Amino acid sequence: MAELKITRENFENEVMKSDIPVLIDFWAPWCGPCRMMGPIIEQLADEYEGKAKVGKVNVDEEGELSQAFGVMSIPTIVLVKDGKVVRQAVGARPKAEVEAMLQ
């Protein structure tokens, strides 16, 4: 399963009402470290299919969502469970560290 593209339109259903954890990658296409994280996010989306949702928010297209999560730097990775942020990491991270957020 490919990662979700999270937008204002699907945010409520895909994130806030999700019955499984949601890992969100706030990114932009012009951001080098964000592009480095892309393959890691894709791998986690495949590996955690059915156990967690993995999605991406393009901060250039979804400024309101970025502001709502207080994103000041990208990439920012946020884990949401039961509609609440439970973990957050800023900057490019190794796969093991991002995966540990899901544990």
Enumerate the predicted regions with their spans.
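Conserved redox-active cysteine motifs that mediate thiol-disulfide chemistry
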Residues: F26-Q43
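Non-catalytic, surface beta->alpha helical segment in thiol-disulfide oxidoreductase systems
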Residues: V78-Q103
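Structural microenvironment flanking redox-active thiols in thiol-disulfide oxidoreductases
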Residues: V59-L65
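Conserved Rossmann-like nucleotide-binding pocket used by diverse enzymes
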Residues: A2, T7, W27, K53-G55
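Conserved helix-turn-beta segment immediately C-terminal to the redox Cys motif
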Residues: D19-P21, G38-V57
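A short beta-strand-turn-helix
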Residues: E3-V22
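Structural alpha/beta surface segment adjacent to cysteine/selenocysteine redox centers
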Residues: L65-I74, V80, K84
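Short pre-active-site segment immediately N-terminal to redox-active cysteine/selenocysteine motifs
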Residues: D19, F26-W30, S73
